[in-house]
């Protein structure tokens, strides 16, 4: 295999064009086999193989800096930068990351996992280079989906204004996770589909591939191309932003990519945007046909009995409620399938809004809808809702607007690593006035909390994990839950275990283990982090000797903080002991393995409590 000879990008430069094409096929096979075993991002990585090889072939990395957006399309980059031998550990505990990781390689310049960051970071690299008097190229690689984010557009504005030597490669595959939406997507489609421009592109690409092209010929070709674009397009958007724009080019045509990159590298030292078009999932029949389904896939596991995920339960419950409440509208940021809102979108397309990768806009857009009498449900992954923190405070909670925030992927999120762990939401939401914060113990309670939230006249957050439910039966109706009311699941003595959300069932498992040791704890489903069930908790805390909080959240600011503050305010003279995630970023790994490591599984909770009781001699 050719890949066995590639220890660094310098080895790529010795290959012929035909060998690069052969290497592309090898890399696709390795990516498919690895992702089918380990899980990971399949379609996006299959679409960027040739692009990645051409970038490393032309530019002198790591001296020249390639700054990737999101990073979930960089598997080829990892394979040709010395990590091929470890690629089988992709996304595994202790293995290589599925994203760009500077602690892993000198070729990974900027840690990433969220969309829209590459242009700002690349501009920072470029300006630092200029101020230090250094000479190298900075190349930002961003997808058309990420380009819709406000942060990316802010950076484009600044890059053009500063007239900085910076190359932006726009990888246009018409998708982020789901098909792209919005005016920018329509603009790029106009570029791709204009018949005269497509004829011109085919002609020039044949010239680029089949001729011995000198700098002068390439410069002429690029100039002619830009002139033709001005005739075809009324508003050459990127030119107005101060970029020299070239493309679209076929992102799977290695000779064309190499020629274009070389010409621009050698001739231009200003903001340049190179527009390439790629096919997401190319090389895998199913991923190519339905790239959204193969954006990210799970590892191979044994088939279990059919238990719906929390995502599925939420999505279907919202459709049921949508039938009853015509004021319900649903909003997501480029993830209708991932959040379960695809069910609602199919049933009520006119009441569904996918705003693209624009979480800040999503929240304030929802605020406007709520202000005018509608009931927005905003479904966003926990880790991505962080991006709209100011909007939640300023535009929603300050005005007490009736918006339901549905935080999918809360808690530990298996193999995607620190950028995707949903372990901060209890903390960052709890400090905001007027916000109700809840977490269901199971899928049935999720349905009832959603129903409760729809009928609540203010901001209401529901968080739940990326997992199947616990397997209990679902009622055929909804029941409203009293706001702030906890649930006592087991009555015991001496030891009080206060658990929330995904930690309630592990706490019950721990209770069964503790019983065999002669320990009979009281188990409480806290359910609402805010407001707390003060009366019930005061009575329970006062009547127990050992108070334990259990949460799948960092220790700072979540359930432990809330109960500790309550104990202090009520002057209860009790010590609260936390079982939570530590004050650190949590690495990648199987979710259950990580819960074991950090003491959040049932048997680990029991072990911790036994240890505590030995220390306090209860």
Swiss-Prot record:
Read off the InterPro entries from this record: Dxylulose-5-P_synthase (IPR005477), THDP-binding (IPR029061), Transketo_C/PFOR_II (IPR009014), Transketolase-like_Pyr-bd (IPR005475), Transketolase_C (IPR033248), Transketolase_CS (IPR049557)
The terms under GO molecular function for this entry are: 1-deoxy-D-xylulose-5-phosphate synthase activity; magnesium ion binding; thiamine pyrophosphate binding
Which Pfam family, an example, fits this chain? DXP_synthase_N
Give the pathway.
Metabolic intermediate biosynthesis; 1-deoxy-D-xylulose 5-phosphate biosynthesis; 1-deoxy-D-xylulose 5-phosphate from D-glyceraldehyde 3-phosphate and pyruvate: step 1/1
Q: Please tell me which top-level EC class this enzyme sits in.
A: transferase
Cofactor binding mode and count: Binds 1 Mg(2+) ion per subunit. Binds 1 thiamine pyrophosphate per subunit.
Assembly information from the UniProt record: Homodimer.
Q: What is this protein called?
A: 1-deoxy-D-xylulose-5-phosphate synthase
Organism this protein belongs to: Dictyoglomus thermophilum (strain ATCC 35947 / DSM 3960 / H-6-12)
């Amino acid at each position: 295999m050719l890949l066995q000879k590639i220890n660094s990008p310098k080895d790529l430069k010795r290959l012929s064009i035909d060998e690069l094409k052969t290497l592309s096929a090898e890399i696709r096979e390795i990516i498919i086999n690895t992702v089918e075993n380990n899980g990971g991002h399949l379609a996006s990585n299959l679409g960027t193989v040739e692009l990645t090889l051409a970038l490393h072939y032309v530019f002198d990395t790591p001296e020249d800096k390639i700054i990737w957006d999101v990073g979930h399309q960089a598997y080829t980059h990892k394979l040709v930068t010395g990590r091929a031998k470890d690629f089988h550990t992709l996304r595994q505990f202790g293995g290589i990351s599925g994203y760009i990781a500077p602690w892993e390689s000198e070729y990974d310049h900027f840690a990433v996992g969220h969309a829209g960051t590459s242009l700002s970071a690349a501009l920072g690299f470029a300006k630092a280079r200029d101020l230090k008097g250094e000479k190298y190229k900075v190349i930002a690689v961003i997808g058309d989906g990420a380009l819709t984010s406000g942060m990316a557009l802010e950076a484009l504005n600044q890059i053009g204004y500063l007239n900085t030597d910076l190359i932006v490669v726009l990888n246009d595959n018409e998708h982020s996770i789901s098909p792209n939406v919005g005016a920018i997507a329509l603009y790029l489609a106009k570029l791709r589909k204009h018949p005269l421009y497509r004829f011109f592109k085919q002609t020039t690409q044949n010239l680029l591939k089949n001729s011995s092209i000198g700098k002068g010929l390439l410069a002429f070709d690029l100039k002619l191309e830009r002139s033709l674009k001005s005739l075809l397009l009324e508003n050459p958007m990127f030119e107005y932003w101060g970029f020299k724009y070239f493309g679209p080019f076929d992102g799977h045509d290695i000779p064309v990519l190499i020629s274009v990159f070389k010409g621009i590298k050698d001739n231009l030292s200003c903001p340049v945007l190179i527009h390439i078009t790629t096919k997401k999932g190319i090389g895998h029949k199913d991923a190519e046909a339905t790239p959204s389904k193969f954006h990210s896939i799970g590892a191979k596991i044994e088939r279990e009995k059919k238990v719906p995920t929390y995502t599925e339960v939420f999505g279907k419950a919202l459709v049921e409620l949508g039938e009853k409440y015509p004021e319900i509208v649903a909003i997501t940021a480029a993830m209708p399938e991932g959040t379960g809102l695809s069910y609602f979108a199919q049933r009520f397309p006119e009441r569904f809004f996918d705003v693209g990768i624009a979480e800040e806009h999503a929240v304030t857009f929802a605020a406007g809808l709520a202000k005018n009498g509608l009931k927005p449900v905003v479904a966003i992954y926990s880790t991505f809702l962080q991006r709209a923190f100011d909007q939640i405070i300023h535009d929603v909670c300050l005005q007490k607007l009736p918006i339901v925030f549905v935080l999918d992927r809360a808690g530990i999120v298996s193999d995607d690593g620190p950028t995707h762990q949903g372990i901060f939401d209890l903390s960052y939401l709890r400090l905001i006035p007027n916000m109700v914060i809840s977490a269901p113990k199971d899928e049935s309670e999720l349905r009832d909390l959603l129903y409760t939230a729809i009928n609540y006249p203010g901001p209401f957050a529901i968080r739940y994990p990326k997992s199947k439910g616990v397997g209990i039966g679902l009622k055929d109706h909804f029941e409203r839950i009293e706001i702030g009311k906890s649930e006592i699941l087991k009555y015991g003595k001496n030891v009080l275990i206060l658990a929330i959300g995904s930690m309630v069932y592990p706490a019950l498992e721990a209770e069964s283990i503790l019983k065999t040791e002669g320990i009979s704890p009281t188990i409480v489903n806290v359910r609402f982090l805010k407001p707390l069930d003060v009366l019930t908790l005061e009575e329970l805390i006062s009547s127990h000797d050992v108070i334990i909080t259990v949460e799948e959240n960092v220790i700072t600011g979540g359930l432990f903080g809330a109960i500790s503050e309550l104990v202090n305010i009520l002057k209860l003279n009790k010590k609260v002991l936390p079982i939570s995630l530590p004050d650190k970023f949590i690495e990648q790994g199987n979710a259950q393995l990580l819960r074991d490591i950090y003491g959040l599984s049932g048997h680990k909770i029991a072990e911790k409590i036994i240890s505590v009781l030995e220390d306090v001699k209860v």
